[in-house]
């Protein structure tokens, strides 16, 4: 459970031991690799994974943003690019490979903007399974990525989506559009919807939107999904 830098100087938070059977990449929300994201990585480590959370805002000094400071979070998000994110994902998976974790051993999970990133990562062929918690960009692409509707047929690994019906930024209609488009993918896909879930329902630090029942179930669904889809050693 430490912060460190990869050989190329890229900062990450890591939890767990390198003799774990599998690794999980944890992709941050718009608020940085903060206490919540670190705690998520710790939970995966407690479940037996080597967890790593890359600092996607590292080009801006790896800031942590207050939950009530939306404008600042949006500013840092606006600085993200498809090229930069791809480089960061590749640096992370290449580091994991040096520890013995090949693509089939690696899961990726992302929250909010990180959910969009984890969906994109599932098209690269560098991870074995992916999960998205309320990731946007379904109809309109973000960070230079195509919309998720366009990326859906290109998925190269199993993907799990976890969405809340009360999410004001991601209407249920869009989620169901995505479900329909995912039928074109050549891999297993699954969407779980939570009737009482708002955007950010998994984050216990955001008390106004946190839903304990949905959060616990969604985390367990992710563990179960990775247990099935990642390579057996």
Language-model region placement:
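N-terminal cap/leader regions of alpha/beta-hydrolase-fold enzymes
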Residues: 1-233
